Amino acid sequence: MKTLDNQTLLYDEDCPLCSLYTTGFIKVGMLDENGKKPFSNLTNEEQIFIDINKASNEIALLDNKNKTVLYGIDSLLKVIGNSFPFIEKIGNVKTIKFFLKKLYSFISYNRKVIIPNKKENGKAIQCIPSFSYKYRILYIVFAIIMTALTLYNFSALLADFPQGNFSRELILSFGQIIFQSIFLLKFDRKTILNYAGNLMTVSLFGSLLLTPILILNLLINI
C-alpha cells in the first residue's frame, strides 16, 4: 500500500467501528504510525483550525504539515484514493458522492444508538454527533423494515405456526415502539427517539442472528 504521510484521522475512540477501520488503515500501510488520534486528545493549537462540531459528525483528516482538514467522505476517499486512485475517482463522481455522503451521515449520526457507550464525563472534549431528527427517524424506519422482513421470512419456516404476512410483522415491529414509548411521554422528543433507536437496534441485531438460518434454508432449497 502507498502510505499517506503526515496525515492524521481524528476518530471517535468510543465508536468501535471508527476504531476498527482507522486501525486497519495503519496496519495495511495506508497511514503511517501517527495516522490516527483520539478526538478527545486534540490540542489547543489543533482546535484553532479544526471545526470541532463538524469533526464530531464527520471524521476529520488532519494534514499535519499544511494544517488543513478534510471531513467525512472526503477524508476517507483521500486515504483510500492514495493507494487506489480509481476508487477516489469513482467516489468523486457527483451522483456517487452524493449517495456516499448520505450513507456516511446515516451511519455517523446514528452511531451512538447503533452501538451505545457510557458517557465519559472526565474528558475535556467528547466526540458526540449532533442530534438529527431526520437521520434518527430514517434509522428507526430502516430497522423496523429490516426486522419485519427477516421475521416474515423466518415465520415461513415454522410449520407449526400460522403463516404470517409482512404487514403483521411490520405492525408488531412498529407496535413495540409505540407501546414502550407510552411510558416515556414525560420525556422530550430527543430522549424518546434515542430510546426508540436503541430499542430497534436490539431488534435489528436479534433479527440478524436469524439471517444465517434463512441463507442456509435458501441454499438447501436451490
Question: What do the predicted segments below correspond to?
Answer:
Residues 157-163:
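Membrane-interface interhelical loops and short amphipathic "cap" helices
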Residues 2-31:
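Local sequence-structure signature of Cys/Sec-based thiol-disulfide redox active-site neighborhoods
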Residues 163-171:
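Hydrophobic alpha-helical transmembrane segments
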Residues 170-222:
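Alpha-helical transmembrane segments of integral membrane proteins
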Residues 46, 52-157, 208-221:
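Thiol/selenol-based redox catalytic cores and closely related redox-interacting motifs
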Residues 31-54:
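N-terminal G-site of the GST-like fold
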